[in-house]
């Protein structure tokens, strides 16, 4: 259970997540990092089984580095997404419990955002939310998204979307992480906050 959000605009991609890590309704960790840097130009959010995600995203990171060494340029994001889809599809009947947003900026497509589910299904999106808090986050995205959004507007909207999920979903909480990926600066963490526990007066 979690909330992850992705928004693609002209100048780059924004990825945002909450920080609560759960096992069912047990809160296992309060400072989880759910945005995985694959390479300087691309990253993925983590929703689902942590061990499965770490395994699959490690493969993607290795493939991205191999591609850069072999071809002397960053891997196209569509190729990376197709590689992940093949891993998930051909792992059947064993299923990796993963649901990931992959976003970044490349020479082929500019700022681009994909969603990949545990069966290997791939969809290209302008904005998307995954995880148990996604109905609340998606509502905020539907209301706030505009085609002409600036990167700063997209960061603000991503934060609002994750906050909406945290307010309503017991599987999301503890704080927010936001990453921006642009052509000029690449992968950059731009916002993080940790919720403080406030005890009632006794």
UniProtKB/Swiss-Prot annotation:
Record's keyword terms, sorted: Autocatalytic cleavage, Cytoplasm, Hydrolase, Protease, Proteasome, Threonine protease, Zymogen
GO molecular function, one term: endopeptidase activity
Pfam families documented for this protein: Proteasome
Activity regulation, free text: The formation of the proteasomal ATPase PAN-20S proteasome complex, via the docking of the C-termini of PAN into the intersubunit pockets in the alpha-rings, triggers opening of the gate for substrate entry. Interconversion between the open-gate and close-gate conformations leads to a dynamic regulation of the 20S proteasome proteolysis activity.
Example of a GO cellular component annotation carried by this entry: cytosol
Role, per record: Component of the proteasome core, a large protease complex with broad specificity involved in protein degradation.
Protein's recorded name: Proteasome subunit beta 1
Taxonomic lineage of the native organism: Archaea, Thermoproteota, Thermoprotei, Thermoproteales, Thermoproteaceae
